């Protein structure tokens, strides 16, 4: 991750992504799309962390790396589906680091992912993260090669993802939206969630 962030995407982890992760971290936090669990190794011991991923192996690996004592819940769930009612209004912060560019479809089809996450936030909670852009940025040769391979294999679906498109879907569900592009990565935060009509699902 560190090599590609620095050399392919122009957004070094320790200089940009990790500070962004820690800046918005709340006491009761949900990390969606857990990856390797790298960011979780840096959270304070006092933090309550819950994990969400469709892949149970990823949940277990990230939990082990972060330290089981920090992990409150491990939730296997499809982010395109509404969350169980028990999760609504529960979290001070929710992170999505390198999740959105891996989800199928264009940026507008990912709006429901933002909506579902917003339901799980407290009224003053913050949704934040980072995603690799395909549109409106200039990729270097290494980045172009990875973009081509990953999109062809279905690992990424982000050739048309833009900062403007991301801002739009965040603004559909939040009053306060901030974005910052570093290299070909956009870091974002969103708070002041709009009123959302609940969708009823089985817990």
PLM features per residue range, with description:
Residues 7-27, 38:
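Conserved alpha-helix/loop element of class I SAM-dependent methyltransferases that forms part
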Residues 28-84:
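Class I SAM-dependent methyltransferase SAM/SAH-binding core
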Residues 95-98:
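A conserved beta-strand element that flanks and buttresses the S-adenosyl-L-methionine
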Residues 103-116:
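A short, conserved alpha-helix within the catalytic core of class I
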Residues 121-127:
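Short glycine-dipeptide loop
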Residues 128-179:
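C-terminal alpha-helical "lid/dimerization" subdomain adjacent to the S-adenosyl-L-methionine
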Residues 173-203:
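Core SAM-dependent methyltransferase catalytic element
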């Amino acid at each position: 991750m560190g090599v590609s962030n620095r050399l392919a995407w122009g957004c070094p982890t320790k200089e940009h992504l990790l500070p962004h992760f820690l800046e918005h971290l709340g006491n009761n936090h949900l990390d969606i799309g857990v990856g390797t669990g790298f960011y979780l190794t840096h959270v304070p011991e006092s933090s309550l962390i819950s994990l969400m991923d469709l892949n149970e192996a990823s949940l277990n690996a990230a939990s082990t790396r972060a330290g089981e004592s920090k992990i409150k819940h491990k939730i296997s769930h499809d982010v395109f589906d509404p969350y169980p009612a028990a999760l609504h209004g529960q979290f001070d912060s929710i992170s999505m680091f390198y999740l959105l560019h891996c989800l199928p479809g264009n940026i507008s089809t990912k709006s429901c992912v933002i909506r579902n996450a917003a339901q799980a936030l407290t009224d003053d909670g913050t949704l934040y993260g980072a995603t690799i852009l395909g549109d409106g940025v200039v990729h270097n040769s290494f980045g172009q090669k990875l973009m081509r391979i990953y999109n062809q294999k279905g690992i990424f679906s982000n050739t048309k993802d833009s900062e403007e498109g991301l801002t739009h879907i965040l603004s559909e569900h939040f009053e306060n939206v901030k974005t910052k592009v570093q290299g070909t990565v956009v870091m974002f935060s969103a708070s002041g969630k709009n009123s959302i009509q609940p969708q009823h699902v089985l817990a």
